[in-house]
């Protein structure tokens, strides 16, 4: 474990919980070294009682030139992702804090630069999702099954309306990992609620608390834009009944807390914000948008 006492505060801390995922974590760390190694970024890995070679990997990485300047890690014992994320938030030095996962690979330099600039330029944005946002709607049907949580009348995924979603951020109700939040927000509204351990709906609850405190929640499809790659996006398998039961419990807890707010605010107008793109960001966006044209034409014909 590495102390941060001699380091300047980071502009962004990426908090990465990990458990027995040595090879993939190594690629994640290498991606941050490659594309953000010269930036004022802190990587904080929370090692959750790993029994593979993760500890040795972290010790080796933290003693490299880049690691001494940018990498810290802390140990926990089978605490689960939510508690590990909170512990990382407590230890983070960054003005901005990212909830990252150990199978997400940074793929460019412009993404971190743009994320920092988003929060500099758009002071009303408190939390930014980097994949997809979620909008929620009031319906009277009870939540009895896991599938009820995903009813399209109740929950809709979005990256904003086409074609403007290539060049702007879209206000949403909530989002999914990865996301970036202002430290100021966490200090005001608190960390992830550990009532949601072990999994899911914790970040939705946080998003609604951020909104209740006066900030907005935004999203942009940065994975689609090539800013990062999430291995889990392509390897999701069949969910077990026990997993669905845990998610159902958490989803019910969320809706018990926030359904009145959903009913009150779902019809509000949604803000948008221009992406503060670098030249590289503009060029990459143009390339990705052109690549998407054939698929878009097929969808419209269908």
Q: What does each model-found stretch correspond to?
A:
Residues 112-114, 173-179, 184-190, 196-224:
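A short, conserved alpha-helix in the catalytic core of glycosyltransferases
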Residues 76-92:
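Glycine-rich, basic loop-to-helix element that forms the pyrophosphate-binding segment
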Residues 47-56, 105:
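A conserved acidic beta->alpha catalytic loop
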């Amino acid at each position: 474990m590495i102390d941060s006492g001699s380091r300047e505060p980071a502009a962004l801390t990426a908090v990465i919980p990990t458990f027995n995922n040595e090879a993939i974590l190594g690629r994640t760390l290498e991606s941050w070294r490659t594309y953000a190694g010269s930036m004022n970024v802190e990587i904080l890995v929370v090692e959750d009682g790993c029994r593979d070679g993760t500890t040795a990997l972290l010790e080796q990485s933290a003693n490299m030139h880049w690691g001494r300047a940018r990498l810290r890690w802390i140990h926990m014992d089978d605490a689960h992702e939510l508690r590990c994320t909170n512990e990382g938030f407590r230890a983070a030095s960054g003005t901005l804090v990212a909830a990252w996962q150990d199978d997400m690979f940074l793929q460019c330099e412009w993404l971190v630069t743009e994320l920092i600039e988003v929060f500099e330029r758009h002071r009303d944005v408190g939390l930014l999702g980097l994949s997809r946002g979620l909008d929620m709607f009031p319906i009277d049907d009870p939540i009895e099954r896991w599938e009820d949580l995903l009813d399209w009348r109740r929950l809709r995924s979005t990256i904003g309306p086409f074609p403007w979603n290539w060049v702007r951020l879209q206000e949403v109700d909530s989002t999914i990992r990865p996301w970036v939040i202002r430290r100021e927000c966490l200090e005001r509204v608190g960390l992830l609620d550990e009532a949601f351990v072990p999994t899911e709906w914790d970040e939705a609850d946080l998003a609604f608390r951020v909104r209740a405190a006066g900030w907005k929640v935004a999203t942009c499809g940065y994975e689609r834009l090539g800013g990062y790659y999430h291995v889990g996006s392509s390897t999701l398998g069949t969910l077990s009944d026990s997993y669905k039961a845990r998610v159902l419990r958490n989803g019910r807890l969320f809706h018990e807390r926030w359904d009145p707010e959903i009913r009150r605010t779902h019809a509000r107008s949604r803000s948008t914000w221009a992406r503060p793109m670098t030249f590289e960001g503009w060029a990459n966006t143009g390339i990705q948008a052109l690549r998407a044209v054939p698929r878009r034409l097929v969808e419209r014909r269908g």
